[in-house]
């Protein structure tokens, strides 16, 4: 279900106050005792969007203006990975790619040390599960880039690694239907070894329909499910495509259902070739060979969503954009 517009406009100086008011309303009124419904959407369903707005205004202490009739801001999404000058003269922020956001204790200590030594002791996290070190003087940049940690947390990762997002998955979440983090990293490494990819492609893995990794706003979103193949229950995914964020944002649509994870790679290869300009490397052979791999993948008469009758699958390739 898509988010419901609050029909509100605030000046940028009031954004933090508004967010705080929304959080306090949820803290005080939200169904947090029921873990199945401990999300903001359930409170909005209970109150209705108009009453929710009233509650937020009361907490904020003033009436909210109505939203602008249309989005007039031209905005391009940035991932903040790399080195960027700040508006403060002589300072930079450095964005590190943390593959699928997986940090160990030693990594955290290392990041804290690096922030202290080269920056102002501050770290920021992004929605793509990456880390930003702000306030790095020009004079310290070169030394920071020599830190061993940056061999794993790169400032210039490969295109698919750069944009990869994954939820916690079944290893640490009882709601997840599939393992996500390790599988997604392994899959991306194989895809990058077999394809030349001209630009980042946002691939988001989420373990269940709760969509913590936001697959509906990704170029390619993978939502965990259970499938049947040859009479066995396997981990699989439904595939979403075409999601965008920023100006004229919209949710992606489900283009393929019930793909066993063990059969997923050739499907992703074909999607990347057809929709994102990827070119198979020489080691892959010609595209006809690739298509034969794909046909073997989708000829799965006994594969279906749990509870549904087995049927032959037809793969539909959607053009993103």
Where is each model-derived feature located?
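Peripheral terminal and linker regions in Fe-S/redox and tRNA-modifying enzymes
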Residues: 1-321
């Amino acid at each position: 279900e898509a988010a419901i517009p609050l029909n509100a406009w605030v000046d940028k100086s009031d954004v933090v106050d508004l967010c705080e008011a929304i959080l306090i309303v949820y803290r005080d009124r939200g169904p947090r005792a029921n873990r199945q419904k401990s999300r903001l959407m359930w409170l909005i369903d209970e109150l209705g969007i108009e009453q929710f707005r009233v509650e937020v205004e009361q907490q904020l202490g003033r009436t909210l203006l109505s939203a602008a009739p249309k989005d007039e801001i031209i905005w391009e999404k940035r991932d903040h990975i790399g080195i960027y000058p700040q508006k403060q003269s002589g300072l930079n922020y450095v964005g590190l790619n943390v593959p699928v956001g997986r940090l160990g204790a030693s990594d955290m200590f290392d990041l804290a040390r690096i922030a202290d030594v080269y920056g102002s002791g501050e770290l920021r996290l992004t929605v793509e599960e990456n880390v930003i070190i702000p306030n790095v003087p020009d004079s310290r940049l070169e030394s920071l880039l020599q830190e061993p940690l940056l061999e794993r947390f790169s400032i210039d990762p490969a295109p698919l690694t750069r944009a990869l997002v994954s939820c916690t998955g079944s290893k640490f979440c009882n709601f997840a239907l599939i393992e996500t983090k390790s599988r997604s990293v392994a899959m991306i490494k194989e895809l990058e070894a077999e394809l030349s990819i001209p630009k980042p492609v946002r691939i988001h893995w989420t373990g269940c329909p709760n969509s913590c990794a936001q697959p509906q706003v990704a170029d390619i979103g993978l939502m965990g499910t259970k499938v049947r193949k040859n009479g066995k229950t396997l981990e699989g995914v439904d595939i979403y495509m075409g999601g965008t964020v920023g100006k004229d944002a919209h949710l992606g649509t489900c283009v393929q259902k019930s793909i066993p994870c063990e059969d997923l790679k050739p499907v992703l290869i074909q999607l990347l070739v057809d929709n994102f300009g990827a070119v198979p490397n020489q080691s892959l052979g010609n595209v006809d060979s690739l298509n034969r791999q794909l046909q073997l993948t989708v000829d799965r008469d006994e594969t279906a969503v749990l509870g549904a009758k087995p049927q032959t699958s037809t793969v539909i390739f959607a053009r993103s954009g």
